[in-house]
Amino acid sequence: MDQYLDVKTPWHLWVVGILSLAWNAFGANDYIQTQMGNVAYYETMLEGIDATPEQALAYFQSYPAWMDAAWAVGVWGAVLGSLLLLLRSRFAVLVFALSLLGLAVTTVYQLVQGQPEWAQGTTTTIITVVIWSIATFLLIYAGSMRSKGVLR
């Protein structure tokens, strides 16, 4: 008999999976809105930040193709990782790791290249720390669930 059939799915997997999917869906929406050049979306997202939607879109849309690809891997990898976690697939670990790699590339690019003045500050730093914390947690959590035989 398959050893994974005996492993009961812990209740927290569903909580983590659903919350991570919701969180990462927000990131996916942000990515789509940026790629589509949605000015109205940026008007709501920039409240309290000293930049126009046009300035913000111009900054994000000026990324080189490889950077945009890394951003896509980070965002869509996180969405796929969340779905794979809910499906109890061991591949969630690999996909979350790839997502974290995409996040690392985008973070390093922004640090090396520099960000516009409006994108620097406490709010941006907090958002970056939260994104890194959640992405790291999801990778560790998925790894833990795989080692316990929950992910097959």
Predicted regions and their residues:
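Topology signature of small-to-medium multi-pass alpha-helical membrane proteins
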Residues: 1-152
